[in-house]
From Swiss-Prot:
Its main location: membrane. Belongs to the SecG family. Involved in protein export. Participates in an early event of protein translocation. The lineage of its organism: Bacteria, Pseudomonadati, Pseudomonadota, Gammaproteobacteria, Enterobacterales. Part of the prokaryotic protein translocation apparatus which comprise SecA, SecB, SecE, SecF, SecG and SecY. GO terms for molecular function: protein-transporting ATPase activity. NCBIfam families: secG. It is found in: Cell membrane. It comes from Buchnera aphidicola subsp. Acyrthosiphon pisum (strain APS). This is Protein-export membrane protein SecG. InterPro entries: SecG. It is a multi-pass membrane protein. One of its GO terms (biological process) is protein secretion. Keywords: Cell membrane, Membrane, Protein transport, Translocation, Transmembrane, Transmembrane helix, Transport.
């Protein structure tokens, strides 16, 4: 499950980069660099880039959603391993109490 989401996450990342770089600039320098008729026809056929901006919004939403899912999956793996090991050894409370005593040695009563 984790591997599937990771592969989809990487694919969405690269496609976001591709579509963001595909957008033409809207400044005056853009006309200097695109004198060919093919570039103008390609970008005008999209319809003032509404299609590309919608795709970018959808991909950005999925990027955020999958990153949250990956974080939750990863944190559950770490937390479950941590509590499983500590429940076997029963060392959480002993170490915790000893650490507090060590920290309070320098403080006068």
């Amino acid at each position: 499950m984790y591997l599937f989401f990771l592969i989809v996450f990487i694919f969405i990342s690269f496609s976001l980069i591709f579509f963001i770089l595909l957008q033409p600039g809207k400044g005056l320098n853009n006309t200097v660099h695109s004198h060919t008729k093919n570039n103008i026809k390609f970008f005008n056929s999209i319809g003032t880039n509404n299609f590309i901006t919608k795709i970018i919004k959808i991909l950005a939403f999925f990027f955020l959603l999958i990153s949250i899912i990956l974080c939750n999956i990863n944190s559950k793996r770490i937390d479950s391993d941590f509590f499983w090991e500590d429940n076997q050894n029963n060392t959480i409370t002993k170490k915790h109490v000893l650490d507090k005593k060590k920290l309070n040695l320098d403080i006068p009563n």
